[in-house]
């Protein structure tokens, strides 16, 4: 594989506070869409099948914490009404600019706030790559309140690659942990950020499903976890500061699967796109120079950037 002779710096603008983590430019989001997993059709088919088999209606879906709405168009193919929400108003504006108004409604709000949505008005709440940021119990209460009885909560977490080559994966983990150190140094409330980082790693520990709100037998489907799961940001020296419990309940059904549709092979440019899809990449570019060079040296030896996208999908039915 040919690689450039120099390592170009990340193009994302520096982050000044945690509130800006995903308040990013259109250029950042364009790279995000290229650098993150291309979700296979089977992911959505599984959600729709579960929803149908559990008596769900196909009326209104709420894309919670949607960012710029990369999955809202797919949801619109099955639901005539799609609510697109994000905590960052600019993201909602970008979503509206490319999705339009036909069947879409937009709102700027965090996951935990749903006072403007009539109780029981949503058939499916879709929360992908957002639940780790939220106050878990407040978010689940808001989701449960908006869902109609028999409605579906579909929650997923994926994003960071896991590489087959152990040496490449080792460098990638150290790059990710360096990013975690940078974000923790900028955090207004480091204990909260530590829990966010912990939730989003390994098996994606989110979404307590209280029995008064959800039927027993919710599925926690863990894809491609055999080699360690989702590559996390939390530095090893901060692991002991995690205070979250395990949010999987005793009535939940945990399923482990390997899915070849979530595999990838990329090149150096593809890796840089992936790296730049994380907000910390632009915060302190010099902090990553040596690590990126270490990875480039491995590629110069003929190593390959193959791997998988570990992913978790949670499916639960509202009582």
Curated annotation (Swiss-Prot):
Pfam families: Methyltransf_11. GO terms for molecular function: S-adenosylmethionine-dependent methyltransferase activity. Pathway: Secondary metabolite biosynthesis. InterPro entries: Diverse_substrate_MTase (IPR051052), Methyltransf_11 (IPR013216), SAM-dependent_MTases_sf (IPR029063). Coiled coil: none annotated. Specifically expressed in conidia. Its EC number is 2.1.1.-. Keywords: Methyltransferase, S-adenosyl-L-methionine, Transferase. Residues 63-155 are annotated as: Methyltransferase domain. GO terms for biological process: methylation; secondary metabolite biosynthetic process. The keyword Methyltransferase applies. Methyltransferase; part of the gene cluster that mediates the biosynthesis of trypacidin, a mycotoxin with antiprotozoal activity and that plays a role in the infection process. The pathway begins with the synthesis of atrochrysone thioester by the polyketide synthase (PKS) tpcC. The atrochrysone carboxyl ACP thioesterase tpcB then breaks the thioester bond and releases the atrochrysone carboxylic acid from tpcC. The decarboxylase tpcK converts atrochrysone carboxylic acid to atrochrysone which is further reduced into emodin anthrone. Belongs to the methyltransferase superfamily. This is Methyltransferase tpcM. The lineage of its organism: Eukaryota, Fungi, Dikarya, Ascomycota, Pezizomycotina. The gene is tpcM.
């Amino acid at each position: 594989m040919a690689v450039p002779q120099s390592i170009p710096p990340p193009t994302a603008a520096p982050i000044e506070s945690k509130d800006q983590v995903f308040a990013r430019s259109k250029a950042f989001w364009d790279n995000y869409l290229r650098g993150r997993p291309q979700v296979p059709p089977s992911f959505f088919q599984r959600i729709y099948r579960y929803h149908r088999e559990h008596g769900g209606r196909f009326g209104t879906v709420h894309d919670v914490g949607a960012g710029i709405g990369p999955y809202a168009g797919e949801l619109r193919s099955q639901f005539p009404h799609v609510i697109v929400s994000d905590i960052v108003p600019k993201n909602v504006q970008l979503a509206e600019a490319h999705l339009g108004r036909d069947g879409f409604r937009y709102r700027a709000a965090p996951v935990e706030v749903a006072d403007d949505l009539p109780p029981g008005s949503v058939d499916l709440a879709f929360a992908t790559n957002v639940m780790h940021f939220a106050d878990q119990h407040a978010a689940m209460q808001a989701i449960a309140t908006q869902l109609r009885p028999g409605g579906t909560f579909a929650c997923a977490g994926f994003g960071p690659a896991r590489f087959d080559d152990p040496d490449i994966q080792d460098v990638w983990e150290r790059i990710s942990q360096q990013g975690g150190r940078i974000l923790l140094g900028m955090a207004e409330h480091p204990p909260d950020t530590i829990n966010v980082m912990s939730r989003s790693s390994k098996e994606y520990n989110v979404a307590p499903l209280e029995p008064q709100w959800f039927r027993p037998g919710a599925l926690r489907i863990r894809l491609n976890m055999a080699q360690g799961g989702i590559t996390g940001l939390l530095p090893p020296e901060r692991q002991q500061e995690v205070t979250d419990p395990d949010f999987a309940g005793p009535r939940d059904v945990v399923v482990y699967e390997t899915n070849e549709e979530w595999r990838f092979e990329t090149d150096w440019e593809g890796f840089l796109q992936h790296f730049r899809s994380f907000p910390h990449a632009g915060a302190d570019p010099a902090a990553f120079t040596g690590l990126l060079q270490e990875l480039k040296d491995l590629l110069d030896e003929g190593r390959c950037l193959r791997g998988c996208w570990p992913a978790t999908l949670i499916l639960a039915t509202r009582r």
